[in-house]
Amino acid sequence: MELDYLLATAMFLIVCVYVISETVNLHSVYDIEEAKKEFLMYYNDLKYNYSISKGDLIFNFKVNKIGYVIEGFVFKDTSESRELIKYLENLNGSYIIAYSPSKDEFIITKNHEFLRIIGHYNISAKYKKGEYGDIEIIYPKNYSINYREFQGISCNKLFEVPFYIVDKNENITLKYYGILEVGR
């Protein structure tokens, strides 16, 4: 009887520790709404105040002292987006600018792999073949990319959360696909 009591107490304590640790992890990782707000704030800053020194704000930002990495942007071909592309090309930055004629969308990224998986990624992390098969590299010039197929993209639910953002302010539609990667 006493052994049963000790065993039940030990199991209860183990479950409590597990639940508390998972709650702490989820609280810091799934603060996605805050991350989206922060991302849109930086995007608006980029539109109006872009400079070389601030350039990394496109790709890195912090929310509640947690560092996030943005893999890239996808946005519709509009007059304002073409101006932004022209401006970025002239800065000679360390990023890749691509265009998809079939989707009529621009893509900006620092990650070569991102061009290979962009459009093949949805919320359930399932592979979707050929959505961006016609990507043309605009910048840097004479740059090419070899595509490879992904059978699936794994997503560690505690640390990496795929999501997208649509910003319809001022007649611009900006979509962001990628991973919020929490510093480990």
Swiss-Prot record:
Ranges annotated as spanning the membrane: 5-27
Subcellular localization(s) per the UniProt record: Membrane
Origin: domain of life: Archaea
GO cellular component, one term: membrane
Keyword Transmembrane in record: yes
Record's bilayer topology term: Single-pass membrane protein
Keywords, comma-separated and alphabetical: Membrane, Transmembrane, Transmembrane helix
Name the UniProt record assigns to this protein: Uncharacterized protein MJ1285
Lineage: Archaea, Methanobacteriati, Methanobacteriota, Methanomada group, Methanococci
